[in-house]
Amino acid sequence: MEADMKLAVVTGQIVCTVRHQGLAHDKLLMVEMIDAQGNPDGQCAVAIDSIGAGTGEWVLLVSGSSARQAHRSELSPVDLCVIGIVDEVVAGGKVVFHK
């Protein structure tokens, strides 16, 4: 996955009772990448979430070193992080998503 911002929809939660200490207090989400119209691209991933996104919500993600910085720790084994819950997407002058 490239190190840029991505759109995704939250498809579920991951529960891990035993995990790396750098991930101890954050929720893990299953996400599916989408394009600007909300069409899934078939790529699913696990993202760390410290802002409270829920199933069905559109989220903004960062990956790589940007994800570690967003997660507040360069030492955490984080590669994908939720950095925003999307309220609206406008593409080509049309509202394609509104919460």
From Swiss-Prot:
GO biological process: ethanolamine catabolic process; generation of precursor metabolites and energy
Up-regulation conditions: Part of the 17-gene eut operon transcribed from a single promoter, induced by ethanolamine and adenosylcobalamin (AdoCbl, vitamin B12).
Entry-linked Pfam families: EutN_CcmL (PF03319)
Keyword Mitochondrion: no
Keyword Transmembrane: no
Keywords assigned: Bacterial microcompartment, Virulence
BMV domain mapped to chain residues: 5-87
SUPFAM superfamilies: EutN/CcmL-like (SSF159133)
One Gene Ontology cellular component annotation held by this UniProt entry: bacterial microcompartment
CDD domains noted in UniProt: EutN_CcmL
Disruption phenotype: A double eutM-eutN strain grows as well as wild-type on ethanolamine (EA) and cyanocobalamin, but a quadruple eutL-eutK-eutM-eutN strain does not grow. A non-polar deletion mutant grows on EA at pH 5.5 to pH 7.0 but not at pH 8.0 or pH 8.5, releases increased amounts of acetaldehyde on EA plus vitamin B12. Preventing acetaldehyde vapor loss allow growth up to pH 8.5.
Biotechnology: Artificial BMCs can be made in E.coli by expressing eutK, eutL, eutM, eutN, eutS (eutSMNLK) or eutS alone. Cargo proteins can be targeted to them and beta-galactosidase (lacZ) was active within the BMC, showing the BMC allows passage of substrate into the interior. This can lead to the development of tailored BMCs for specific metabolic reactions. The addition of eutQ to the eutSMNLK construct results in biogenesis of multiple BMCs.
UniProt superkingdom: Bacteria
Compartments, as annotated in UniProt: Bacterial microcompartment
Chief place of localization: other
Pathway in which the depicted protein is active: Amine and polyamine degradation; ethanolamine degradation
UniProt cross-references to InterPro entries, sorted A to Z: EutN_CcmL (IPR004992), EutN_CcmL_sf (IPR036677)
Family listed: Belongs to the CcmL/EutN family.
Further remarks about this protein from its record: The need for a bacterial microcompartment in EA metabolism can be bypassed by increasing the levels of EAL and an acetaldehyde dehydrogenase (not necessarily EutE).
Function statement: Probably forms vertices in the bacterial microcompartment (BMC) shell dedicated to ethanolamine degradation. Expression of eutK, eutL, eutM, eutN, eutS (eutSMNLK) in E.coli leads to formation of a single BMC. Coexpression of eutQ with eutSMNLK permits E.coli to make cells with more than one mobile BMC, as is usual in vivo. It may be involved in transporting positively charged molecules into and out of the BMC. The ethanolamine (EA) catabolic bacterial microcompartment (BMC) probably concentrates low levels of ethanolamine catabolic enzymes, concentrates volatile reaction intermediates, keeps the level of toxic acetaldehyde low, generates enough acetyl-CoA to support cell growth, and maintains a pool of free coenzyme A (CoA) and NAD.
Subunit structure: Homopentamer with a small central pore.
Protein's UniProt name: Bacterial microcompartment shell vertex protein EutN
Taxonomic source organism: Salmonella typhimurium (strain LT2 / SGSC1412 / ATCC 700720)
Lineage, opening ranks: Bacteria, Pseudomonadati, Pseudomonadota, Gammaproteobacteria, Enterobacterales
Gene, per the UniProt record: eutN
